Amino acid sequence: MARRGLLISFFAIFSVLLQSSTSLISSSSVFVNPSKVKQVSSKPRAFVYEGFLTELECDHMVSLAKASLKRSAVADNDSGESKFSEVRTSSGTFISKGKDPIVSGIEDKISTWTFLPKENGEDIQVLRYEHGQKYDAHFDYFHDKVNIVRGGHRMATILMYLSNVTKGGETVFPDAEIPSRRVLSENKEDLSDCAKRGIAVKPRKGDALLFFNLHPDAIPDPLSLHGGCPVIEGEKWSATKWIHVDSFDRIVTPSGNCTDMNESCERWAVLGECTKNPEYMVGTTELPGYCRRSCKAC
């Protein structure tokens, strides 16, 4: 299975990288140092890369975004359309992948760290949170049948912190499972009340938080529920990269056609995957699968 195989392969590779404290992974001129990565949660899977972005990269992204900030919106769970909501009170803008060499370099760095294709990612969204602004707990995978058509679910999310925040502004996972023998990496006194409601990551300029919205079998992970705590003192700048299961750049074909969306569908169907993994292969009326033709579902 392409989707399931991609996820499982990634986690296998990533676990090896986390065990290495000295090796560097490179792609062309892009280097990733596993020793700077620490796991902050296992359920959901979440990791922080300390110093992922340089000071220059952070300041450059903020500079690009300042001129085109607009109030942030959320996706309606039924229609999939964007709407304004008090759930999300930040302002933001999208930076195209090939905007300039610095942005392209960040895109390369993300792909090298995650082992995920650049074409699966959306453009980077830069956000500004001023005093009192926040993003209530939400999921990054989709509940509507519109957004999922292009690239499938958002498999992974990377939050890159572009500024330090004096107080507040943490990213919190309120439903994350907290190990009974957890060693606290943060002094609870340094966290806001919002952040104390679960496992939280304090925004530090240059750091990046990577977490997965799906389980390795491509099923949505409800423990990936997360939110951005209100900024109490200072200002918060961040950049979000959503990475989908499949290509986000690929042109979506018109609906109504009985086609397979993966060249391996016919082989998988012969191997019995239509019944073993019906969510991916067949799907539902609202969220059609990727191999409906080979599974004789249309």
From Swiss-Prot:
Residues 120-245 form the Fe2OG dioxygenase domain. Fe cation binds at residues 138, 140, 226. Keywords: Dioxygenase, Disulfide bond, Endoplasmic reticulum, Glycoprotein, Iron, Membrane, Metal-binding, Oxidoreductase, Signal-anchor, Transmembrane, Transmembrane helix. PROSITE patterns: FE2OG_OXY, SHKT. Its EC number is 1.14.11.2. 2-oxoglutarate binds at residue 236. It is an enzyme of class 1 (oxidoreductase). One of its GO terms (cellular component) is endoplasmic reticulum. The chain crosses the membrane at residues 7-25. Its cofactor is Fe(2+); L-ascorbate. It is found in: Endoplasmic reticulum membrane. It comes from the Eukaryota. It catalyses: L-prolyl-[collagen] + 2-oxoglutarate + O2 = trans-4-hydroxy-L-prolyl-[collagen] + succinate + CO2. It is a single-pass type II membrane protein. Glycans are attached at residues 77, 164, 257, 262. Residues 1-6 are cytoplasmic. Binds 1 Fe(2+) ion per subunit. Residues 258-298 form the ShKT domain. This is Probable prolyl 4-hydroxylase 4. It comes from Arabidopsis thaliana. The gene is P4H4.
